[in-house]
Amino acid sequence: MKQIIYISIFTILFTFVSCNDLLNPTPVDRIIDDQVLTDANSARVVLTSAYRDLANLGAPKIIAGDLTADNLIHNGTFTLYREISSKDMSASNGSSSALWGVIYSMSYIASFLYEGLPEIDISQLEFNELTATASFLRAYAYFVGAYTFGGIPIVTSTIVEDNRKIPRATFEETLDFVETELLYALDKLPEESFNSGEVTNGAVKALLARFYLYKENWSDAEKYATDVIEGNGTKEYILEEDFENAVVDFSTESILEIVYSANDNPGTSTSFSINNLFVGRREIIPSSEMVLALQNDGGDRQVIIEFDGTNARGSDNGWTIVRYGPFDNIQLFRLAEMYIIRAEARTQQNKISGVNSAESDINVIRERAGVPLIQGSSQNQMLLVIENERRMELCFEGHRWYDLIRTGRAKTVMDEFTSNWTDKDELWPIPLREITNNPSLKDAQNPGY
C-alpha cells in the first residue's frame, strides 16, 4: 500500500546571508512523498526522517534549557536570542517556532509509520522495533513540548485538514500521552545498537527515569535510573573516569546522542551549528554567574569554558563555551544524569545517607569532577546540592530552565539573576503562526504573550 503524506508544519530556515531571514520565518511544507512501504528496510528509510528531526530538536532544546535560565546570556545581534535572554520573548520568536515545528514533524512521521506498517508483510519483531522507535521519538518530542509550552495538541493522524483543527490538550493529557508511548516502547527495542546514535531500550528507560523525576514519581524514577546504571534490560554503560571524556562523541556513558557530520547543520533547522553560536559568532556566551559557579564547584568541568581577554569588553565577559566542536554530537542522555536522577529520587524518599543513598550517588559524580564529597546533609540541603550538581554536570546540555520550573525554584533563582523575570517566563509562547493557522488555538495562548 502506497503511503503518501503531505506534512504542513511551520519551521524556521536560517541562512548566513540575511538577518532578515532569521527574524521573518517562512512557512515550509515538509513532504514525505512517494515513500512506498514495502518492507522493513523501506520503513527504516522513513524513520531516518524522524532521526533527522531529532537532530533539528537538539540546539533549540539547549537554547530553551540554558538561555531561558541563568546559564547563558545573549552577546550578539540576533533578535530571537536577545528576546529569550532578556526575558522579553514574543509569540513570533523564531526559536519557539523552530521547536514547535520539529515536534509536529516528528509526530507526523510516527503517524505515517503507524498507519502504513500494518499494511506490509514484516515480522512481529520488526514491527515492534519500528513502532517502538517511532513511539520513543514522538514521546521525547512531546515531553520537550509539554515542559516548554505546557499542554499542546496531540496529533496521531496524517490527515492534515483534521490536524489543523485539533485543540490544545491539557498539560496532564500531554504527559499521559508521553507515558503511554514510552511504556509501549519499553522492552521492544534492542539493548545495544551500532552506536549511541540509535534508540535502544536503554534510551527508553533513561527517558522514563527523567519523565518520572519530572512527574515526582520518585520510586519509578529511582527504578528506571537504577535499571540503566546496573544494566538491567540495557547494555552496560560505563562512567568515564574523566569528565572531559564523558562529553565527547560516543563515550562509554552515552545512552543516546544526536549524531552529526560535516554534511549536517547541527542542532536547528538552520545553518548555524550550536558551535557557531557558542564559538564562531559568540552569539551566546556563558553568564558570569555560570562561570563563577564552575570556578567555585565545577572542578574538572571547567574544561567546557575558556577565557580570552581580547573579547572582554562592555557586556562581554570574555568567556566562551567550548563544550561542542564544529560537528560534535549532542548528548541527550548519559549515565551521569541517571546517577543524579536517582540521587534526587532517593532524597525525596529520605534515602539520603548510607549505602544505596543519594549521597553515594552524588559523590560518584563529584569524585570524578575532583570536588569535595558530600556528607551529613539534611533533605533540604541535599536537594540544593543536587540542583547545583545538575547545573555543573549537565551544563549547556539544556536542563537548567526545566529543572528550576519543575522544582518551583525558578522565581527565587531567577529574581537574583535578572529583574526582568516574571511568571510568564515559566513557559514559552505558542508560535503566532500556529495560532493563525489552527482556529482551535485562537484563545489558547500562554498567559502574558
Predicted features by range, described:
Residues 19-65, 225, 415-449:
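Membrane-proximal, proline-rich intrinsically disordered regions
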Residues 33-34, 60-80, 155, 190-270, ...:
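Short, surface-exposed recognition loops and adjoining beta-strand edges that mediate ligand/DNA contacts
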Residues 44, 79-149, 186-194, 324-333, ...:
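Conserved, well-structured interaction surfaces
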Residues 47, 107-110, 114, 175, ...:
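Inward-facing hydrophobic residues that define packing positions of alpha-helical scaffold repeats
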Residues 68, 78-79, 222-331, 335, ...:
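Hydrophobic-face positions in mid-chain alpha helices that act as interaction patches
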Residues 103, 177, 267-269, 282-284, ...:
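Long, intrinsically disordered, low-complexity segments
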Residues 218, 352-355:
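TPR-repeat structural position
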